[in-house]
């Protein structure tokens, strides 16, 4: 049977209501909607995205949850008029004017110096539309009509207390709300000082102790912005950027105590990424560390892991557990150590191709997996690190000097050391010779740019030294090249200003540090055996570049010595086909070395120890002119050879000689140093009864006691050498020590020459009693086991003329003669004899500094010897 196709019946056309027509939609789109917060009109297309940005501030105390609803109810509310869901609040009466009035942002800052921490500040909850032009709902079901009918009868919507996020207020209340919820974006130094005073008052009246590192950081900030510089000005608003001042204000005023603690902890550590969970375990004094992290992110002090965008950074902070979990996900062998796992994941991310042929998506997938396994990670922002480094540098440039890392590799964190020293001074466990409180401040930075350049230069040098110690010579050389480019691009006026500063101030400038970085470059090139390039860098520092010849005066002699060594020995002569050509080239190199020696001898900045080394090289060089006369004339020191017992067995630490002596009381052999073995030999076999291994500490202590008021003078004339309370010496305890105190030194030398023995001894006892608990650069109290009596007894054994000559050499050229003293100082109080002994073990040789001091002691009538200790093997290990 054939099927009959039914005809489609078309009914009458029903007109569409205007509210659901396309014209209404265009009209509504053209009208747009007005933001209830900023009172700006937006199109419907951009209104939703704008509301995601223009949301209620985190400190708004007028937000109140009026109702909760499901996803379906939210859809209906967006499509309908202004409605309030639920009947449970229909009978409640909510006053239109609440008792608690809104206060302006200024009033809040005055009354609440520490606003509460907001744990979460994402108020992206969709609310009912406030527009009266909403489209009709798509369907007119009975359920929807009943809900709408019930809600319209409720009077709560009209009388309720409305949130600024949900409804429009009057123009006046709207402006007040915006003042309350918008973060303070500007501040002045006076406001920062007021906040600091409020902070100090609050912690003084609080029962809960504030961590020392927070109090010390605030103390540093207060001194920087409130202490007058030497020119009568302050580090005020015209010195700092507006962003710097608002950062200071937010740190003191807006951050909670926990957030302050976390920020300072992150600052004194390396600026790396850190696991929040590990920080929570490490810093138990921070009660709510997660809330503190949220607060610091809100005020833009730190970054969260959303900015962790490189695979190398993620791999660097991942522990072995995280790496194994990620390796398992990508089916990589996880039975490896951490270093091998890092290499495997990096190789996998860079070698595997995605379906589109690239490796980027695979790398992103590995990075995403690492971030998932790591959890929450935070990092202090680089601009915050630089800003706080500026504060610490201004407070104490001596302690925060990057040269401390070179001289003492254990000082890896100078900023943490500074905070700890401030704590020690505050609780009285350590005393320093600096005035406390110190009324002075470093005043040689004309503007913020100069200060920031110096801070950046210190960071560059620290990185360069770290790369050198790790053996990454190529990276270290790149950093040195950056320093060289900075010097070449520095304006001439700025170079002249730096040259006008005194030496003890000039060493805290960027030009000084970058010049020192160029000196590091020569060491890097020598380690790479690129002696030709090293010579070119050294010539530039010493001869060609006139702008840096007033910098790093202490290092110029060393650079000269290394350059001459490279020219004389290390620089290989190219082999030419002809022997005569090779010989000619060799002669040219030696002639160049002789020429450089003559130029070096005219450099007044060369210290005696390098001058002696250059003189030794000149005497060996045949190409020197026949009329050459050595500038120094030193004799050969007396030598003595002794034997001491050593252990013949190796204990596995690489030491060849282990000296021992017999302890008769315990009847056992005791290990000792070669200096101790020599000291015991002299006391047992020579005329001396007392001796110490001090390497000059005894002589420095006597010098410090007799000239204490001159060296550590704190009057107004010497104000520029004291910058903070934690200095253990004036900043000019170097080349310019004598020049700034010449008259006082000469008066003291005349007094020591004519004063009787008892008067000088009484003066030594008086200074010892006053300063024996003080930590300073000159006096080493621990080397005198019997205290002041040992110190007086050795003073009685030193001939007066010899003592004056030794102390004059120290005073007039402190930087050149502060080191190199012989190892042992021996004396006999009964016979009034004294001697200095330089001890050398098997294979050791004298340095130029030691040769100079031995010659100087001998020339002034003090017994000076070189004691060579030979090993006498013992087969018994007791």
UniProtKB/Swiss-Prot annotation:
Function: Nuclease required for the repair of DNA interstrand cross-links (ICL). Acts as a 5'-3' exonuclease that anchors at a cut end of DNA and cleaves DNA successively at every third nucleotide, allowing to excise an ICL from one strand through flanking incisions.
Annotated residues for binding of Zn(2+): 35, 38, 50, 54
PANTHER family assigned to the protein according to its UniProt record, in alphabetical order: FANCONI-ASSOCIATED NUCLEASE 1 (PTHR15749:SF4)
Residues in coiled coil: none
Positions annotated to bind Mn(2+) 2: 695, 823
Record's protein name: Fanconi-associated nuclease 1 homolog
Enzyme class: hydrolase
The EC number(s) this enzyme carries: 3.1.4.1
Catalytic activity of the protein: Hydrolytically removes 5'-nucleotides successively from the 3'-hydroxy termini of 3'-hydroxy-terminated oligonucleotides
Compartment list: Nucleus
InterPro entries xref list: Fan1-like (IPR033315), FAN1-like_euk (IPR049132), FAN1-like_TPR (IPR049126), FAN1-like_WH (IPR049125), Rad18_UBZ4 (IPR006642), tRNA_endonuc-like_dom_sf (IPR011856), VRR_NUC (IPR014883)
Record's compositionally biased regions (Basic and acidic residues): 142-161
Family annotation (SMART domains): VRR_NUC
UniProt binding sites for Mn(2+) 1: 823, 838-839
Alphabetical keyword list: DNA damage, DNA repair, Hydrolase, Magnesium, Manganese, Metal-binding, Nuclease, Nucleus, Zinc, Zinc-finger
Cofactor: record remark: Binds 2 magnesium or manganese ions per subunit.
Family: Belongs to the FAN1 family.
GO terms assigned for molecular function: 5'-3' exonuclease activity; 5'-flap endonuclease activity; flap-structured DNA binding; phosphodiesterase I activity; zinc ion binding
Bias kind Low complexity: ranges: 168-179
Alphabetical GO biological process terms: interstrand cross-link repair
Organism of provenance: Caenorhabditis briggsae
Zinc finger map (UBZ4-type): 32-59
Sequence ranges assigned to domain VRR-NUC in this UniProt record: 757-870
